[in-house]
Amino acid sequence: FNTTERQVMCWLIKPEDLKWNNSCAKRLAQIPANGGTPLAEVYDKMHPILYSKKPDIFLTLSDGEPSDPYAVSSMIKSFKSFGIKMVALGVGRDTLSATIIATNLRHLGFERTLGVSRLKDIPKKVLDVLGSN
């Protein structure tokens, strides 16, 4: 999910029947980061899907702070109660900002967070995160 002209957009990165691979990671890296994503709203829309599918891992990419951190933290707790491991990748313009974003995401309740400042590094970071679980 991301926002385009204040609309929440959904992107299909990996079909359900396909294993995660480099092609999926590259598709993920092509989603434009433009900030302003109402993460709690996105998670609320995902809630029925995640409840029914109960994936092992739910990966969030973020380029900043959620608009409602308390609601996001509550949703993360809810997803974790389903047995879903919540992981986040903070994307920043440089190493320092990426690290700050990743640290802030950790405070929301994500079990694992990483920072990345170069878009070309996203596929490897995603594969590293998913491979370590």
Enumerate the language-model features and the residues they cover.
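Acidic, glycine-rich A-domain
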Residues: F1-N133
